């Protein structure tokens, strides 16, 4: 008999405002403890020195974390000109120091070269894996691993501030884009070097910024609930966004009880409103006007033109 997981089944997505100096995994484990959740997973690590939006998927919501990994993101970054570091951020060792003599025109021209779709070689100080190990582990041992340049897209790049040796940017990018690499490349293009002084992720996909919450706020809610002898879940769970928020924008199809049961057992079905191809959100309900329609997971259109299960929600009542 399989060992039962410790914790409760709580499902959803928490928009954590990750603090400076904390690893994404440490933040994840803290949220998991506060919620006493059986399962938890984040949707793309933020560097310890970075702050901002870190969606934490709980319970069955972890099945859909990959879709948030694949979505675009927005950052506010402050680049320090004149100093290049090993890690391209403030935590690395200084590689070079140069005098900053950059005009507004030079900066504008350099920034324009990053807009649109370009190639980027991932930083050695990244979580990308090579032979099962993250690149940053090789980097710490002084080992340089060959990396292929990848297509990235900078949808929007706005200059917020330029004061001598500091450049503040708002940047909206595709998945897999490394901001520290953009800043390092910018410094090389300007001929003076640069590194990330401050980095904040302000958006992941279409998630609302106002729904973010900090760890101290969560801890305070838990402490107050215990002091008032209130079940913590009564105050914590309303902070969660629904699981289907992770696949917002994906085409929706609708099935009846029998078809839902078939999907839960791994079988493809015919669905209402299904497209000819691609991934789909699957709901137990009549159609898009059914206010009680229940999200049961993500499927895809197979070669037979049926909706096949890909990530199906399994709740305790089933």
UniProtKB/Swiss-Prot annotation:
Keyword field contains Repeat: no
Active site per database record: 47
Assigned EC number: 5.4.99.25
Keywords on record: Isomerase, tRNA processing
A GO molecular-function descriptor: RNA binding
Organism encoding this protein: Colwellia psychrerythraea (strain 34H / ATCC BAA-681) (Vibrio psychroerythus)
PANTHER family: PSEUDOURIDYLATE SYNTHASE TRUB1, TRNA-PSEUDOURIDINE SYNTHASE
Catalytic activity: uridine(55) in tRNA = pseudouridine(55) in tRNA
Superkingdom to which the source organism belongs: Bacteria
Protein name: tRNA pseudouridine synthase B
């Amino acid at each position: 008999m399989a060992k039962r997981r410790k914790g409760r089944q709580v499902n959803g997505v928490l928009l954590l405002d990750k603090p400076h100096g904390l690893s994404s995994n440490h933040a994840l484990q803290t949220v998991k403890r506060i919620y006493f959740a059986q399962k938890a997973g984040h949707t793309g690590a933020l560097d310890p020195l970075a702050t901002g939006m870190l969606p934490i998927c709980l319970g069955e919501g972890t099945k859909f974390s990959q879709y948030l990994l694949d979505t675009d993101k927005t950052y506010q970054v402050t680049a320090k000109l004149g100093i290049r570091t090993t890690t391209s951020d403030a935590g690395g060792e200084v590689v070079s120091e140069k005098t900053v003599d950059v005009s507004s025109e030079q900066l504008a021209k350099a920034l324009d070269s990053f807009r649109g779709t370009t190639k980027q070689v991932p930083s050695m100080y990244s979580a990308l894996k090579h032979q099962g190990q993250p690149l940053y582990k090789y980097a710490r041992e002084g080992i340089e691993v060959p990396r292929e340049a990848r297509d990235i897209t900078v949808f929007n790049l706005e200059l917020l501030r330029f004061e001598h040796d500091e450049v503040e940017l708002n940047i909206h990018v595709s998945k897999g884009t490394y901001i520290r690499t953009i800043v390092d490349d910018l410094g090389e293009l300007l001929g003076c070097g640069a590194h990330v002084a401050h980095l904040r992720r302000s958006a992941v996909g279409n998630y609302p910024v106002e729904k973010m919450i900090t760890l101290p706020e969560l801890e305070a809610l838990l402490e107050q609930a215990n002091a008032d002898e209130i079940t913590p879940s009564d105050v914590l769970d309303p902070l969660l966004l629904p699981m289907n928020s992770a696949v917002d924008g994906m085409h929706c199809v609708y099935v009846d009880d029998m078809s839902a049961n078939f999907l839960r057992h791994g079988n493809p079905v015919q669905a209402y409103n299904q497209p000819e191809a691609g991934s789909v959100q699957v709901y137990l309900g009549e159609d898009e006007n059914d206010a009680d329609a229940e999200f049961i997971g993500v499927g895809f259109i197979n070669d037979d033109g049926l909706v096949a299960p890909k990530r199906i929600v399994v709740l305790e009542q089933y």
